[in-house]
């Protein structure tokens, strides 16, 4: 009887230890919040896919918020996330200029934060990591490519459909492009900034640009929808191929346009990859592992003749989810 009692006690003790271990494991499980500026834009959905994918791989829980392109909503989201007990944040900010109060608050709460796609306002240092494209070098490379497209078509005047210039990534793109235009002998005759990042807006702006400057020979698209909108305008005007287009970011839509030679080049930005890498950096901060503060990912140029290569496919796997 005593042996049976001892056996039962051992079993009970084992069960209790297992339960305690389970509770301890649950308590150790971390949560990462993804704050998107807007989830109406595919790019930010894809960053979120990367955050969620990496969180699952690391054993973290995932929650997401959208800031609806409002700095006030962005701040509310950060406070809500902290109140709900998240351990870390990955953010695509509404703008770089909106980040100082956000960073001050998260520092006061000891919450690690990684930026994805858009970095903090220049001069800010109280962040864990910033995972962006190498926007300046990409701006130079894309500027040179666009200038070459213009010259191939008999001119040197180019137009630009730009991201909002209150974003540090857009400022770096523009600086690089302007340097390339000056070095290569092209003139940027007009730049129009997007507000909504929609194809319809890009169509309107491209139409306005070509009406004001019919001698434009190439268009620099700083974001994916700009390339789609510009291609639509050229098709409507019967100018496909006669005016060159290069675009940054990349999507199934612009890949199809590239294959159809409606655009001539895509500088791919790794949206999924930025989400993955940003999540890893905040996880490293939580676990006292080494952190890389500033990661500037290369944006490789892919042209129609290279789109089906193994190298291009490896890049595209970090741009948007496989289901797309």
UniProtKB/Swiss-Prot annotation:
A single GO CC term for this protein reads:
periplasmic space
| Signal sequence extent | 1-18
Record's subcellular location: Periplasm
* Superkingdom classification of source: Bacteria
Pfam families named among the record's database cross-references? Peripla_BP_4 (PF13407)
Gene3D superfamilies xref list: 3.40.50.2300
A single GO molecular function term of this UniProt record: carbohydrate binding
Output the InterPro entries linked to this UniProt entry: Peripla_BP_I, SBP_2_dom
Keyword field: Periplasm, Plasmid, Signal, Sugar transport, Transport
UniProt similarity note: Belongs to the bacterial solute-binding protein 2 family.
Query: What is this protein's function per UniProt?
Result: Probably part of the binding-protein-dependent transport system y4mIJK. This system probably transports a sugar.
Q: What is this protein called?
A: Probable ABC transporter periplasmic-binding protein y4mI
Q: Which organism is it from?
A: Sinorhizobium fredii (strain NBRC 101917 / NGR234)
């Amino acid at each position: 009887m005593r042996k049976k009692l001892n056996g039962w006690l051992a079993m009970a003790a084992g069960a209790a230890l297992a339960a305690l271990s389970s509770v301890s494991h649950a308590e150790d499980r971390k949560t990462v919040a993804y704050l998107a500026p807007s989830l109406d834009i595919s790019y930010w959905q894809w960053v979120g896919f990367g955050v969620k994918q990496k969180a699952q791989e690391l054993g973290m829980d995932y929650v997401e918020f959208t800031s609806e392109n409002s700095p006030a909503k962005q701040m509310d989201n950060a406070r809500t996330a902290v109140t709900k007990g998240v351990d870390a944040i990955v953010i695509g900010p509404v703008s770089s200029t909106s980040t100082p109060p956000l960073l001050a608050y998260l520092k006061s709460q000891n919450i690690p934060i990684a930026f994805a796609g858009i970095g903090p306002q220049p001069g800010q240092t109280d962040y864990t990591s910033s995972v962006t494209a190498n926007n300046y070098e990409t701006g130079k490379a894309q500027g040179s490519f666009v200038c070459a497209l213009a010259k191939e078509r008999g001119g040197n005047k180019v137009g630009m459909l730009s991201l909002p210039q209150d974003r540090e990534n857009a400022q770096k793109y523009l600086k690089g492009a302007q340097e390339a235009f000056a070095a290569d002998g092209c003139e940027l005759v007009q730049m129009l900034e997007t507000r909504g990042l929609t194809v319809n807006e890009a169509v309107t702006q491209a139409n306005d640009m070509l009406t004001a400057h019919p001698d434009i020979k190439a268009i620099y698209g700083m974001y994916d929808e700009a390339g789609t909108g510009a291609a639509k305008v050229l098709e409507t005007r019967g100018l496909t191929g006669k005016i060159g287009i290069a675009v940054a970011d990349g999507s199934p839509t612009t890949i199809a346009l590239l294959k159809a030679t409606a655009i001539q080049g895509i500088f791919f930005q790794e949206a999924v990859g930025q989400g993955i890498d940003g999540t890893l950096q905040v996880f490293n901060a939580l676990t006292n592992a080494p952190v890389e503060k500033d990661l500037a990912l290369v944006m490789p140029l892919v042209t129609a003749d290279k789109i089906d290569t193994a190298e291009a496919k490896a890049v595209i796997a970090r741009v948007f989810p496989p289901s797309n």
